[in-house]
Curated annotation (Swiss-Prot):
Binds a second Mg(2+) ion via substrate during catalysis. This is Enolase. Mg(2+) binds at residues 242, 283, 310. Catalyzes the reversible conversion of 2-phosphoglycerate (2-PG) into phosphoenolpyruvate (PEP). It is essential for the degradation of carbohydrates via glycolysis. Pathway: Carbohydrate degradation; glycolysis; pyruvate from D-glyceraldehyde 3-phosphate: step 4/5. GO terms for molecular function: magnesium ion binding; phosphopyruvate hydratase activity. It holds the Pfam family Enolase_N. The active site is at residues 205, 335. It catalyses: (2R)-2-phosphoglycerate = phosphoenolpyruvate + H2O.
Amino acid sequence: MAIIEQVGAREILDSRGNPTVEVEVALEDGTLTRAAVPSGASTGEHEAVELRDGDAERYGGKGVEKAVEAVLDEIGPELAGVDAIEQRVVDQKLVDLDGTPDKSRLGANAILGVSLAVAKAAAESVGLELFRYVGGPNAHVLPVPMMNILNGGAHADTGVDVQEFMIAPIGADSFSEAVRWGAETYHSLKSVLKAKGLATGLGDEGGFAPDLPSNREALDLIASAIEKAGYKLGRDIVLALDVAATEFYRDGAYHFEGSKRSAEQMAGYYGELLDAYPLVSIEDPLSEDDWDGWVRLTSEIGERVQLVGDDLFVTNPERLEEGISRRAGNALLVKVNQIGTLSETLDAVHLATSCGYKSMMSHRSGETEDTTIADLAVATGCGQIKTGAPARSERVAKYNQLLRIEETLGDAARYAGELAFPRFTPEA
């Protein structure tokens, strides 16, 4: 047994200089582990709720002392004496103790920190790496790194509407090779931008954030960078988008590239992009509550491209069930802090997989050095992870952890590669 002796918490900073929660769990056998909680810039309306202090005199109201107190005063005493191996028991206690549907009383940031720290403690106590503890003996698939190398939308102060332009090195033979290809393309993009006299400042997630006239211009620049780095666009490296359409949906219309567009017009735009570029994945192409638009879009282009629900599903099994029943989207974005416990996160991935939906593990724009999602990507075998550009330590930490896992697995390691995107046929 791995009995929980004490649960502690503190306020730390995330990668954007905002406070977040870090939780420590101590077991009776001497095990001590910690987990830090991420935070998003573009957050879905239906996400579990972070508890912030609201005191304008501290951190502009974004302090998390209340969440820390919730861990110390309520959650810690409740979990003392509980076996950390019983993850579902722990997570159910957290949900019951909070007592709200959106975890707003204790805060999803407090609850998630505890849930993840408990899992880490249990894994360490039994002598297993986290990916092996959560995923079992057969966890061996390394995900395709979806590297966000050009930022727009809420992640950058520019005229580019699409929030993330990603590259996916599907033609690599291993995860380590994929990381190298991505890093080389990232540096190539910097030189392409410099040659055109464009800014090379970075967005929240480490991608470049030049002010460009259109979203297509961003795709063209990335295509040039891929070729300049010596790789074949559409065979070695393909493209993906996070549109984050909820961010520019107002009054029943999409305010996109200087005009108001309907869901049908957005669908036509995406169809044109698919004809022009090797796109394998489009995340949040429509607003989080535009169910009818999502259904039509999935019917029109869902056989050609992965359509990922982030704000639409918010890693919530109930929202995902509704999407599956309506045939809206065909993939789930997995953000542990959207739902707030490890058990519920794993339930969402299992539901997606069992219904033929793909899953993509994801960071948030406000990250820490915590690498839990890297282990979860391998544990779930989801085959895809997005955790920013190959730059900024809070992003690179996840890639480095995956490199370690690949090394640990040795000959058993398998890189997901093009199999992660069954709707896409690579060029010869």
